[in-house]
Swiss-Prot record:
GO molecular function: UDP-N-acetylglucosamine 1-carboxyvinyltransferase activity
Subcellular location as annotated: Cytoplasm
Descriptive protein name: UDP-N-acetylglucosamine 1-carboxyvinyltransferase
GO-annotated cellular components: cytoplasm
Chief place of localization: cytoplasm
NCBIfam families in the record: murA, PRK09369.1
Purpose of the protein: Cell wall formation. Adds enolpyruvyl to UDP-N-acetylglucosamine.
Pathway: Cell wall biogenesis; peptidoglycan biosynthesis
Modified residues (2-(S-cysteinyl)pyruvic acid O-phosphothioketal): 117
Residues annotated as binding phosphoenolpyruvate: 22-23
Enzyme class: transferase
UniProt keyword terms in alphabetical order: Cell cycle, Cell division, Cell shape, Cell wall biogenesis/degradation, Cytoplasm, Peptidoglycan synthesis, Pyruvate, Transferase
Length: 419
């Protein structure tokens, strides 16, 4: 199994190019199931989750593959097997996104209950509620969601809770339904808007994009399109925090600062100087950093996917701070690993309090989920001495060539085989 070996204490500086957003690419890949013909998607990161979903599409009968470094082609003309099997999707919760498209185009779907990060309950009840509201019969049997519908019908419905993948699944199902669907309490995340724009490029009729109420007028069929996904705001934030903890100065290119304003504001509160451009963000860190308290919430508030990275920052910042996690339970599994590195950190319920220390010490640590792995990389960059991070397959699920990008900024980091 592979590990990352990091020698801390190196200042990060230079420029780095941001990859396409995993959380935008995955639903758009699922949406290609709605179309007969070949759809081409640009700015696709080469990630484990992306490869898994391509394998799922191919298993169904599609022809899905990379045609260039960051370009994917999907021809879903001849889907013969509308099933997402457990063997393929057990590592990825986004697999449930094929439910809506399969049901809309083929009238049936069988999707294994999703796996992915071990960060508490991520229920699919809102997905099931949405499909039933559109007229589908849905059962959960032996670990699979099985759905059937002769024809989906437009409906007005309200999500009980804000859910990104739930919104996306209902959106994809509704575009081919009879009549108009009005979806209230829809997620506002930029990745949801990106999917909606892609669907409209395929011929869908979606209004209210970027608001909490989406109106979808069903159409008879969609057509292929050529679409470029938005940049990864979480990768952008992660690399900016990595630069901050090393007292660094970097420019993140091909990104969109308006997508992560809540993160940039917290970096400024920590003492960093931030410059925003149309397609770049520049950060210059001023030490000592100041600890920042924050509370995760749906977009446009502070994203849960940046919580762990800021916890690493707070561990080496001046003062104490509290981080409150409101989105997912059990998303503090990186705390014991930070403690191994010398962090002063305490959990009470859904709140973590940190008391900054002068320096962390390198240690062998283990990643437990995608963002926890990023947190440990950041902590290792700030630490004194060598850190070896195990289970970095979590990192590879969501970050494209992370060690290559960090090495380009001056980090001493290498991928090694576990002894």
């Amino acid at each position: 199994m592979e590990q990352l070996k990091i020698m801390g204490g190196r200042r990060l500086e230079g420029e780095v190019t941001i990859s396409g957003a995993k959380n935008a690419v995955l639903p758009i890949l699922a949406a290609t199931l709605l179309v007969k013909g070949t759809t081409v998607i640009d700015n696709v990161p080469r990630l484990r989750d992306v490869n898994t979903l391509l394998a799922v599409l191919n298993e169904m009968g599609a022809k899905a593959h990379f045609t260039a470094e960051n370009q994917v082609s999907v021809d879903a003309s001849n889907i013969t097997n509308p099933v997402a099997p457990y063997e393929l999707v057990r590592t990825m919760r986004a697999s449930v996104l094929v439910l809506g498209p399969l049901l809309a185009r083929f009238g049936q779907a069988k999707v294994s209950l999703p796996g992915g990060c071990a960060i508490g309950a991520r229920p699919v009840d809102q997905h099931i509620k949405g499909m039933r509201a559109l007229g589908a019969e849905v059962d959960v049997c032996e670990g699979y969601i099985e759905a059937k519908a002769s024809r989906l019908r437009g409906q007005t419905l309200t999500m009980d809770v804000v859910t990104v993948t739930g919104t996306e699944n209902i959106l994809m199902a509704a575009v081919l339904a009879d009549g108009t669907t009005v979806l209230h309490n829809a997620a506002l995340e930029p990745e949801v808007s990106d999917l909606a724009h892609c669907l409209n490029a395929m011929g869908a009729k979606i209004k209210g994009i970027g608001t909490s109420t989406l109106t979808i007028e069903g159409v008879e069929s969609l057509h292929p399109c050529h679409y470029r996904t938005l940049p990864d705001r979480i990768e952008t934030g992660t690399l900016l925090v990595a630069a901050a903890v090393t007292g660094g100065s970097i420019v993140a290119r091909q990104t969109s600062p308006q997508l992560l304003e809540a993160v940039l504001e917290k970096l400024e509160a920590a003492g960093c100087s931030i410059r925003r451009g149309a397609d770049f963000v520049a950060l210059e860190a001023k030490k000592p950093l100041q600890a920042v308290s924050l509370r995760t919430a749906p977009f446009p508030a502070f994203p849960t996917d940046m919580q762990a990275q800021f916890m690493a920052l707070n561990c080496v910042a001046h003062g104490s701070a509290a981080i409150v996690e409101t989105i997912f339970e059990n998303r503090f599994m990186h705390v014991p690993e930070l403690s191994r590195m010398g962090a002063r950190i305490f959990i009470e319920g859904n709140t973590v309090t940190t008391f900054g220390v002068e320096k962390l010490s390198g240690a062998p640590v283990m990643a437990t989920d995608l963002r926890a792995s990023a947190c440990l990389v950041i902590a290792a960059l700030a630490a004194e001495g060598e850190t070896v991070i195990s289970r970095i397959y979590h990192l590879d699920r969501g970050y494209e060539a992370m060690e290559v990008k960090l090495r380009g900024l001056g980090a001493q980091i290498e991928r090694i085989q576990e002894a």
